[in-house]
């Protein structure tokens, strides 16, 4: 059994992206709409944050929050220090246009078969994968982790090549 700190260290060693900002999941109580937005230290502070009148991307007062061990701890436990639901994401594209990982998303009705075929293709060419069930339960992400940052364009080409190879064996797979 690993200590909480060891679990955080393992998670951070795999799911590496930008350290200066991370996306946080939100869910609107009014509309039920959900998504991810950059975590901001000024969010909803009266007189500073002008949401919803102004979008975060256009806000002169935005102050992104960095990825910390606490952020990872909250993500892994599912709630923040105040006990509120907490889910963090990762911005994989680094500022120099490299990345530490590639995630491929499958969410069509045949996602189970598609993921299996895609993972088989990757393993056949010697690439280890991690398969993660989507939050909704109606899809999955297939993750590839690199030992060092690689050009994002190269990672994308690798993913496209694997999809093309998979499609030659499983014609039902669509982009």
Stretch-by-stretch model annotation:
Residues 139-141, 168:
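Low-complexity, flexible helical/coil segments
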Residues 4-138, 145-161:
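Signature for HUH/AEP ssDNA processing cores
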Residues 163-175:
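Flexible helix-coil linker/hinge segments at domain or subdomain boundaries
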């Amino acid at each position: 059994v690993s200590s909480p700190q060891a679990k955080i260290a393992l998670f951070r060693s795999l799911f590496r992206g930008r350290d200066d900002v991370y996306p946080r999941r939100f869910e609107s109580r009014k509309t039920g709409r959900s998504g991810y937005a950059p975590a901001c230290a000024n969010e909803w502070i009266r007189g500073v944050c002008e949401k919803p009148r102004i979008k975060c991307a256009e806000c002169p007062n935005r102050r992104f929050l960095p990825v910390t061990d606490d952020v990872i701890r909250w993500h892994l436990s599912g709630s923040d220090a105040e006990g509120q639901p907490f889910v963090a994401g990762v911005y994989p594209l680094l500022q120099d246009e490299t990345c530490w990982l590639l995630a491929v998303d499958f969410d069509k009705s045949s996602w189970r078969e598609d993921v299996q075929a895609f993972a088989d293709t990757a393993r056949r060419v010697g690439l280890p994968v991690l398969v993660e069930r989507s939050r909704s339960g109606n899809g999955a992400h297939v993750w590839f982790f690199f030992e060092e940052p690689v050009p994002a364009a190269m990672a994308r080409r690798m993913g496209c090549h694997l999809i093309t190879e998979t499609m030659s064996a499983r014609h039902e797979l669509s982009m």
